[in-house]
């Protein structure tokens, strides 16, 4: 039988990572909207509601409890963590990073916290790339490319801007995408 070349296998896995990272970005967007809707659905639009001042504090508190008692690991500094994983030439990110940053940021943003979705979704997409690549026993070089694919797909999906995802990966993460 005919076997796939390394380049073909990496391309197929990269496509799968792109789909999964895009689904993660979509899930984050929908989860934020769901939380916001649940919290503010009954509010009257033209009057002051003091809960707008309380919700961000509650969201940060819930996020802190989630990180301390469920995750039990530091999930902050998403982009810095990805850069560190790439710079060590290992490109290894923990499996829980495929979902924990997503849940924590959805809680914080959904409750009105003033944080962005970029760092958590970059960490999520990169972790998907890293863990799927390791599942298929890819080399460190291929893992680095797959981490970049996950980051690019996640940024492209969260901002609905495919070129921005690619530019982010090439410029900020400085990943050489040659296989």
Where are these predicted regions, by residue range?
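Alpha-helical transmembrane segments and immediately membrane-proximal extracytoplasmic
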Residues: 1-179
């Amino acid at each position: 039988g005919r076997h796939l070349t390394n380049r073909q296998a990496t391309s197929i896995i990269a496509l799968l990572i792109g789909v999964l990272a895009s689904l993660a970005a979509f899930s984050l967007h929908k989860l934020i909207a769901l939380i916001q809707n649940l919290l503010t659905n009954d509010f009257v639009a033209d009057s002051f509601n003091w809960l707008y001042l309380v919700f961000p504090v509650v969201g940060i508190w819930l996020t802190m409890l989630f990180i301390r008692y469920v995750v039990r690991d530091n999930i902050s500094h998403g982009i810095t963590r990805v850069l560190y994983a790439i710079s060590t030439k290992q490109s290894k990110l923990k499996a829980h990073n495929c979902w924990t940053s997503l849940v924590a940021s959805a809680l914080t943003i959904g409750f009105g916290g003033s944080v962005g979705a970029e760092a958590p979704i970059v960490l999520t997409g990169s972790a998907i790339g890293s863990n799927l690549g390791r599942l298929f026993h890819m080399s460190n070089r291929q893992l680095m490319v797959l981490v970049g694919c996950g980051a690019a797909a996640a940024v492209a999906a969260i901002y609905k801007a495919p070129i921005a995802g690619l530019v982010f990966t090439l410029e900020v993460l400085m990943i050489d995408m040659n296989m």
